[in-house]
A protein has these predicted regions:
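Short beta-strand elements
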Residues: 221-242, 255-257
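Conserved beta-strand/loop elements of the cytosolic catalytic core of P-type E1-E2 ATPases, chiefly
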Residues: 263-265
Length: 402
């Protein structure tokens, strides 16, 4: 059990904050990241120890893409991955986020005799899949809450699907949570124990669109949910950081977690991103927060009015900051590029974001938007208020109705 006195320090690191009273390190000195999918290997991928010893083993330098038999993306040519921005035929842009957008809010399924969760920190991993590639349901199940977050090993997990978010749950099957290293890496997710790797059967493959998955572990009654967006290569989307970019400060989540409240959002941020979504850009969020903040991150986005989309935290207990955050985010962008997916717009607030966006080759540079941060090295665009973007985004072409 970690000492309670260390919680505030852990939370500050978890949310990517620099130590209070210190200045941020210069992330522009970090090494550039290749756009190959394996680049996430440089970031640590271990979870909190599960044996109570307090000694979590490092797993850096492990490959981070699954072998072909376990979900290697079908599209590997980065030269074909530029985002589509319009269709001269007058048809909607392939993969655009068009109405009607499903609410994906049907009441979750239950099992006979199911009891309330005792922990509430188990989590699913949202995914973008390109049509035709293997589709995996990924998650992690833990017990005992924070700060223990102990892996559930050998638990039976029931996997339910709400196809097209139509409100009808169907059980796809069951799987068993792993122990450390049991399963090969899939979609960059290394097996740190308590993991779910469930490949959707070919005859149940998800069509283009948005789908919701809900999982229930039947011994601790922990649950987890996730979204899957199936899109064509080149689908238009945006990616935003969270802490300091959408929240009102880099440190806010740390203190709000301890006080059991949610951070405030920067004024007009939700309106700006909602405008992009209304123009057909699929929402996405990549944060260097620790994985156990998955649910709070989703709650923040929903409560503060941000458009719902694919959301990724790190895969580690401590989260990442500085160079580690840049490496993590660069690896996430590399995996997307390998699928043929490159964001049309990105939003950040730190030098680690600037480095990751440059490694991801996001073009044009003025689509790299930084909130109250000047990207002097790579030429991204500074804004001091999201209100500056509203008129511009209002005038963007509608990818659903060109």
């Amino acid at each position: 059990m970690r000492a309670q006195a260390s919680l505030a320090c852990l939370m500050l690191a978890a949310c990517g904050a620099e130590p209070i009273g210190s200045s941020a390190t210069n992330q522009t000195e970090a090494a550039s990241i290749s756009t190959d999918v394996g680049t996430t290997a440089d970031a640590p991928t271990t979870d909190a120890p599960t044996d109570g010893s307090g000694d979590a083993s490092a797993t850096a330098d492990a490959p981070t893409s699954a072998p072909a038999s376990t979900g290697e993306p079908a599209t590997t040519d980065a030269t074909t991955s530029e985002p589509t921005t319009g269709d001269p035929t007058g048809e909607p842009t392939p993969g655009a986020f068009c109405e009607p957008v499903p609410a994906c809010d049907a009441p979750p399924p239950t099992l006979p005799g199911q009891e309330p969760e005792s922990s509430g920190y188990s989590r699913g991993r949202d995914m973008f899949y390109v049509d035709g590639e293997p589709q995996w349901v990924l998650g992690k199940f833990t017990k005992w809450g924070f700060p223990a977050d102990k892996d559930i090993v050998g638990g039976t997990v029931h996997v339910f699907l709400d196809r097209d978010c139509a409100g009808e749950w169907v059980e796809l099957g069951t799987t068993v949570t792993t122990d450390d290293g049991d399963h090969p890496i899939v979609e960059g997710v290394e097996d740190s124990g308590g993991r779910v790797y469930f490949e959707i059967p070919a005859d149940q493959a998800l069509a283009l669109g948005r789908h919701r998955v809900y999982m229930i572990e039947d011994s601790e009654w922990e649950s987890a949910e996730l979204l899957i967006d199936v899109v064509p290569a080149g689908a238009p989307f945006f990616i935003s950081d969270v802490d300091g970019t959408l929240t009102t400060s880099e440190n806010e989540e740390a203190w709000d977690f301890l006080n059991d409240t949610l951070p405030d959002a920067n004024p007009f941020a939700a309106e700006a991103l909602s405008l992009l979504a209304s123009k057909g850009y699929r929402p996405g969020y990549i944060t260097a927060r620790p994985e156990w903040l998955d649910r709070r991150t989703r709650e923040f986005l929903a409560t503060r009015g941000f458009p719902r989309g694919i959301m990724h935290t790190t895969l580690i207990y401590e989260g990442a900051m500085g160079d580690s955050a840049a490496l993590y985010k660069s690896g996430e962008f590399a995996q997307l590029r390998q699928k043929g997916l490159v964001p049309a717009w990105v939003f950040g607030n730190k030098d680690s974001d600037a480095l990751a966006f440059d490694n991801a080759m996001i073009d044009p540079p003025d689509h790299r938007v930084f909130f109250q941060y000047t990207d002097a090295t790579y030429g991204g665009r500074r804004i001091d208020s999201y209100e500056e973007l509203l008129a511009e985004f209002e005038l963007l072409p509608d990818l659903c109705d060109p």
